[in-house]
A protein has these predicted regions:
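Nucleotide/phosphate-binding catalytic cleft detector across ATP-hydrolyzing
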Residues: 1-85, 90, 102
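Short glycine-rich, Thr/Ser-proximal phosphate-binding strand/loop in the N-terminal lobe
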Residues: 97-116
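Extended, hydrophobic alpha-helical segments in both membrane/secreted and soluble proteins
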Residues: 91-95
Length: 116
């Protein structure tokens, strides 16, 4: 199961003839016209895309109601995708920072559940 993935995009720059917004450029480049974008990702677009010379990486998260764009970063960051795994047990809490591309656990921490 894929929880999220990244795609690097070289977006076309705006011109007098092509005045689409950055969101529309991203959706067109992904060929995902119905994808939604989180408010945080949407707010990050300006001036990020122009400063990155329209070369950006988007993080996508597939769900029951389609694909969400949850983050936009300048440049190509497809080599780095981290996730957090949580295990909330009846007696202990465990967390692991995971490299989602390799499955390698980078860090882990645990503690006794204080509600016990």
């Amino acid at each position: 199961m894929t929880f999220s993935y990244k795609r690097f995009l070289n977006l076309p720059k705006p011109t007098k003839e092509d005045f689409r917004g950055d969101r529309e450029r991203i959706l067109d480049a992904l060929n995902m016209p119905d994808a939604s974008m989180t408010l945080e990702a949407l707010r990050s677009l300006y001036p990020l895309t122009a400063r990155a010379d329209y070369a950006v990486t988007v993080t996508l998260c597939p769900g029951d109601r389609g694909t969400d764009i949850i983050r936009v970063e300048p440049g190509d960051t497809t080599h780095r995708l981290l996730g957090l795994a949580l295990d909330i047990g009846s007696t202990t809490l465990e967390m692991e920072l995971v490299d989602m591309l390799t499955g390698q656990v980078l860090q882990n921490v645990g503690c006794v559940n204080s509600q016990v």
